[in-house]
């Protein structure tokens, strides 16, 4: 075997230590200092948006069941898609004047309720000096607490998101099991060899489902590579629908809840939603409303029923994988976003079911690792960190690549093809709508444009340069006010400045997103502006990051 289990455990231990130390540093920092650095926000609870169209159309409402909070404009606001732990504190501790030298960790000991949330829209209020922001992901428990106690107007503190330490602890348990008949053993104990990656080319049409399901009737593993916009979620939903029809039990696991909900909302699964055959762990208030027929299930209890699909994140499924290996309860396990899975999680799928489909793209974002590049190289941990890449390079499983892009027009598709060993063909069913006579920087038939400007060396968040980028967005909006635009950058500090420049001019718009590249993989928009500051350019131009940003 290439890696001993002890080597694998050492990698996970080191990464868990790095995560723990980083979070411990935050816990031991004075809460008032985190407030000053915009790592903590003091907000006022306005309401829970439990009805569709409950908010004006000028605000970016990505569904309903959202938590609406009021912010002081001069204190800054979160960036869209930024994740937090929302905390309700005991009365005396809800105001910063009572915090003194209290650390964030000590302040959390005064909480009466909490939930992970993330910001999905920003907008102006009628009150001078205040802004409204909307948050998705609030737990059903915290939602019920706010409603039952009629807490409109109370203070809610937003603080650092808790890291997935239990996920790493689960994977350590998974890879430490040395039982001779252990299902994950087949993946974990691979030998040193190189396989030529040569997947069969297919499209995402539903006609492919017969061939895929027939193959899985006599084989246990299948790997899909899905370049940007090639319809992998559409195809995955069609496969799941077929398996439910055949009375199979299916688990779909992904890194994010967003990916799972996108799958559940596909047309192929609508009938099964109504029949309560689509189940999900850790359903949030907004998910329960935007996907109203989804069936919430207990996260600690493995829910496996013939003729149904269970949706669960890596975080939760890893906990199941460490205890259910003797049964392999599911008939089929489908891992979405597999390119963002550690190798231990790739292997854990074998514990969960008898037949496995891994779907990812090794040319897009890899897992986020806190260990330094030097540590990864020196200890030869790269293959353990980039699990899907290792699966494609070291295992001779049947593989497919989706080669038709529904998202990109021909020029853009041909540029994206540069990242792949096979051409990506555009089958987009829309026309190029940009007025090149008014927007001189736009290309004639789509594709990429380069816009140069003077930038100070070493500055990630230069206000004048960020304002220039927003000027470009303003020019686009003046010609095409309804077009969907993403403004992306590698660095959080850059994104914060871009958001400040945008919000001060436009407030919150439902068709403009400003975020880091890492948070938007799989998203579709009409125009993407990728801002590359004049510092650490190798990071902004890293191959997989650049592919995501420009595709």
Where are these regions (language model features)?
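Accessory interdomain/linker segments of ATP-dependent helicases and helicase-like nucleic-acid enzymes
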Residues: 1-99, 473, 488-493, 500
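Pre-ATPase regulatory/linker segments immediately N-terminal to the P-loop/RecA-like helicase/translocase core
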Residues: 2-20, 72-217, 273-293
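Hydrophobic anchor at the beta1->P-loop junction of P-loop NTPases
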Residues: 224, 252
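Conserved lysine of the Walker
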Residues: 232
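Hydrophobic positions on the alpha1 helix immediately C-terminal to the Walker A/P-loop
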Residues: 235, 239
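Conserved helicase motor core of SF1/SF2 NTP-dependent helicases
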Residues: 246, 254-258, 315-318, 326-335, ...
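Conserved helix-turn-beta segment of the N-terminal RecA-like "Helicase ATP-binding" lobe
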Residues: 258-288, 501-509
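Inter-Walker segment of RecA-like/P-loop motor cores
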Residues: 270-317, 515-516
């Amino acid at each position: 075997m290439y890696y001993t289990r002890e080597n694998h455990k050492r990698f996970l231990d080191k990464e868990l230590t790095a995560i723990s130390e980083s979070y411990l540093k935050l816990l031991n920092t004075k809460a008032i200092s985190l407030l000053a650095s915009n790592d903590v926000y003091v907000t006022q609870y306005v309401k829970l948006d439990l009805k569709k169209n409950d908010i004006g159309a000028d605000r970016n409402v990505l569904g309903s069941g959202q938590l609406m909070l009021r912010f002081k404009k001069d204190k800054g606001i979160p960036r869209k898609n930024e994740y937090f732990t929302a905390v309700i504190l005991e009365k005396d501790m809800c105001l910063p004047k009572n915090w003194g030298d209290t650390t964030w960790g000590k302040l959390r000991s005064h909480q009466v309720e909490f939930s992970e949330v993330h910001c999905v829209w920003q907008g102006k209020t009628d009150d001078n000096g205040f802004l409204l922001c909307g948050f998705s992901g609030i737990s059903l428990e915290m939602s019920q607490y706010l409603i039952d106690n009629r807490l409109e107007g109370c203070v809610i503190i937003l603080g650092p998101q808790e890291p997935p330490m239990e996920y790493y602890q689960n994977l350590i348990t998974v890879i430490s099991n040395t039982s001779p008949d252990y299902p994950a053993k087949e993946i974990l104990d691979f030998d040193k060899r190189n396989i030529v990656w040569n997947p069969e080319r297919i499209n995402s049409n539903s006609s492919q489902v017969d061939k895929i399901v027939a193959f899985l009737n006599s084989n246990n593993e299948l790997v899909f590579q899905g370049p940007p916009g090639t319809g992998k979620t559409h195809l995955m939903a069609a496969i799941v629908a077929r398996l439910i029809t055949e009375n199979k039990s299916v688990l779909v696991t992904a890194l994010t809840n967003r990916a799972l909900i996108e799958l559940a909302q596909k047309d192929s699964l609508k009938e099964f939603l109504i029949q309560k055959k689509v189940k999900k762990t850790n359903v949030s208030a907004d998910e329960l409303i935007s996907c109203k027929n989804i069936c919430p299930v207990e996260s600690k209890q493995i829910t496996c029923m013939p003729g149904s699909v269970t949706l669960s994140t890596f975080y939760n499924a890893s906990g199941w994988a460490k205890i259910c290996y003797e049964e392999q309860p599911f008939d089929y396990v489908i891992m979405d976003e597999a390119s963002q899975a550690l190798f231990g999680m790739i292997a854990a799928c074998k514990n969960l079911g008898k037949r496995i489909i891994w779907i990812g793209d090794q040319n897009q974002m890899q897992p986020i690792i806190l260990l330094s590049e030097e540590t990864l190289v020196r200890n030869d941990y790269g293959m353990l960190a980039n699990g899907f890449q290792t699966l494609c390079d070291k295992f001779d499983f049947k593989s497919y690549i989706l080669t038709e892009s529904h998202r990109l027009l021909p020029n853009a598709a041909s540029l994206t093809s540069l990242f792949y060993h096979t051409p990506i063909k555009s089958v987009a069913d829309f026309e190029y709508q940009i007025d090149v006579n008014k927007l001189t920087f736009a290309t004639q038939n789509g594709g990429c444009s380069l816009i140069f400007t003077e930038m100070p060396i070493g500055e990630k968040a230069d206000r004048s340069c960020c304002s220039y980028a927003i000027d470009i967005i303003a020019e686009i909006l003046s010609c095409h006010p309804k077009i969907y635009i993403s403004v992306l950058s590698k660095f959080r500090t850059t994104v914060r400045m871009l958001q400040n420049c945008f919000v001060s001019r436009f407030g919150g718009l439902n068709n403009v997103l400003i975020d880091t590249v890492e948070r938007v993989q799989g998203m579709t928009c009409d125009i993407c502006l990728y801002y590359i500051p004049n510092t650490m350019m190798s990071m902004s131009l890293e191959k997989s990051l650049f592919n995501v940003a420009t595709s």
